[in-house]
Amino acid sequence: MLEKILKKTIHNQLDSFSGWDEQKVKKFQQDLLSWYYDQRRRLPWREKPSLYGTVVSEFMLQQTRVSTVLPYFERWMKEFPDFRVLAGADESDVLKLWEGLGYYSRARNLHKLAKQIVELESIPQTRAEWLEFPGVGPYASAAISSIAFEEPEAVVDGNVVRIFARLFKDQREYKGTAEATKKMATLTQSFLNIDYPGDHNQAVMELGATVCLPKKPLCLICPVSECCLARLSEPEAFPKIKRRAKRQVIVSRAFSLSNSKLLLYRHPEDAPRLAGLYELPKLESLVILGRPRLLFSRDRAISNDKIKEKIYNTDIAENDLPAGHFWVNVCHIDEVPMSGPHRAWVIELISKLD
């Protein structure tokens, strides 16, 4: 049965069907798992597995490197050790602990998810059920349901697409990663080890993160290299995904300090990305007294934008502030939630004044 499914799946999707049958797929699965059990990174959410730890790690790992996540995960688990404690926390405390990880909607959605979980009579176990929670998409729902409950659902993200595109030397061009993951879903599901779906998914993710890298893949130590068609030519050429040109953006911001108080802007609660977070205000929103003086410029990237942030020393009309702008005593700066870059800029500038 599996052989028929594979032939239909691979023939329909790729031209490079090369004798894959049930035996070859089983060898792929076994080689992958053997490598994973022997070489996997010892990560806290793997060493002490729990549903809550799995959910937290999946939220944190969205668009963020493992090395960055590790200290945040450890602090989070100490402060909010389970769904109930997290559900009872103030959002400001949740955002403060998340500070520096970016993409703060993840923290708010995780907080909302915890509140919903504690109200349920039983914990959901299927991918379909987890898809109903805020912030849980196709990838996270498959990861959570397979790792925590052994549901046979394959994960598909950019790492997984890269592995299978190279495995079959996929010549198709995709408009973006989203299209590639959608078209690879049936194929990756056909390769899933249904006896150990959670470990299989983690093994594939581990392979993409540590061996089958976007640049300079480590083909010589890859556990499944012997069945990879791209390994002998140009593996870096796969997958073929069109890259959008990054948009150049310039943002001018005010650093205004008066009577030991710093002017900050607080995003409203209905803001799409940074709700409730404080930041240095934009010059365009303020009434400036005199001529601003450039303090420094910083380059950063958010999604598809390349942003040049220019920070100016400015004098502000203190009694005529627009909505959402507040004077915050520098002694209390640590207490307000800010994004990582803004926190770093504020600390740097205040330290220069001492």
Question: What residue ranges belong to the model's regions?
Answer:
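Catalytic cores of DNA base-excision repair glycosylases
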Residues: S16-W20, D31, W35-L220, V224-E234
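Intrinsically disordered, low-complexity, charged terminal extensions of DNA damage-control enzymes
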Residues: M1-R41, E47, E206-D354
